[in-house]
Regions:
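Hydrophobic beta-strand-centered segment that forms part of the acyl-chain substrate-binding groove
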Residues: 37-72, 76-79
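Hydrophobic residues positioned within well-ordered beta-strands of beta-sheet architectures
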Residues: 6, 54-56, 71-73, 87, ...
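Hot-dog-fold acyl-thioester-processing enzymes
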Residues: 1-55, 109-132
Length: 132
């Protein structure tokens, strides 16, 4: 599996005064997709070790409006380093149009310093590593 796909639903409270999903809500969608991806690759210890986000970026391609239809989020791992890994996300609206692209870098962390990625997590991440 090189791409993990999940769906999230918008809530009316996600909207800004213009009727668009507010930019900060995208981070919630990405967090949900990230956790689901890690759980899907059978890394059950996902919530049992410390990770910190070192980087997060979002490129907004088109507004997301309210709909009861789900958004589709595709998640890939683009690189796995010694202490960190990079995830890429693509959010599609209900018409299949690309609404946003995002990237995050997660760092394994313990006692105020970066630590090597646990072997079990490394293997799980490599199962959805996207080879360019």
């Amino acid at each position: 599996m090189s791409v993990f796909v999940t769906q999230v639903y918008r809530r009316f409270s996600d909207l800004d005064p213009l009727g668009h999903v507010n930019n900060v809500v995208y981070l919630d969608y990405l967090q949900e997709a990230r956790l689901r991806a890690l759980m899907q690759i059978d890394y059950a210890d996902t919530l049992k070790f410390s990770q910190v986000m070192a980087h997060q970026s979002i490129e907004f391609r088109r507004p997301i409006l309210y709909s009861t239809d789900p958004l589709t989020i595709k998640v890939t791992i683009s690189s796995v380093g010694k202490t960190s890994y990079r995830m890429k996300y693509r959010i599609f609206n209900e018409l299949g149009e690309l609404a946003a692209e995002a990237e995050s870098v997660m760092v394994c962390f313990d006692n105020d310093k970066a630590v090597p990625i646990p072997d079990k997590l490394r293997s799980a991440l490599q199962s959805i590593l996207e080879v360019e």
